[in-house]
A protein has these predicted regions:
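ABC ATP-binding cassette signature C-motif
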Residues: 1-190
Length: 190
């Protein structure tokens, strides 16, 4: 799935066929390894690049106020990224991505390392995002909370689109066995 995202974004070249890009697409990409973060810079400098104010949805915001939306205190915002936990780095990457103008948000396993507060924040931000979100996630409950359409790779080159999230796909006749998933009580979303 990550390879497919990289192919679609031009990070990998296909071995056959072509990938055709749309026009006027501004992509923000959340990679599960968080490569877009500069570990030596502070949280503030990763987002604002030396500025005190940043433009968010056409409005000027003080960077500390904006980072507060992503649960960073002013003191923590001055911390080098290398000192942050995995969850804090994920929050920072989200803050950085949502500070850039984009109409296509690509998320590769965005819920890895997230605490409950950050997961709720991510859900809220995604629900208000004014664009298209393309996401790879194994977090079925998260998908049920935020997606309106699901692409399912059903094997033998078949990809189908279903309205809604994981539970909606099951109600529409989807089978976890089709995906090689064993559904146990503990694996089911609650």
């Amino acid at each position: 799935k990550t390879t497919l995202l990289k192919l679609m974004l031009g990070g990998l070249q296909p071995t056959s066929g072509t990938v055709e890009e749309g026009t006027r697409i501004d992509v923000a990409y959340f990679d599960q390894l968080r490569h877009q973060l500069d570990l030596e810079k502070t949280v503030i400098d990763n987002v604002a690049e030396g500025r005190d104010f940043i433009d968010i949805d056409g409005q000027s915001r003080h960077v500390l106020s904006y980072l507060g939306d992503f649960l960073f205190s002013p003191q923590r915002a001055r911390t080098p990224v290398k000192a942050l936990s995995g969850g804090e780095r994920a929050r920072l990457l989200l803050a950085k991505l949502f500070s850039k103008p984009a109409n296509l948000l690509v998320l590769d396993e965005p819920t890895n390392d997230l605490d409950v507060e950050t997961l709720e924040l991510l859900e809220e931000v995604l629900l208000t995002f004014n664009g298209t979100v393309l996401m790879v996630s194994h977090d079925r409950a998260f998908l049920d909370n935020v997606v309106t359409s699901t692409l399912v790779f059903e094997g033998e080159g078949k990809v189908r689109e279903y309205v809604g999230g994981y539970q909606d796909w099951l109600r529409q006749g989807g089978s976890p066995r089709l995906l090689g998933v064993t559904e146990s009580k503990s694996a089911r979303p609650t």
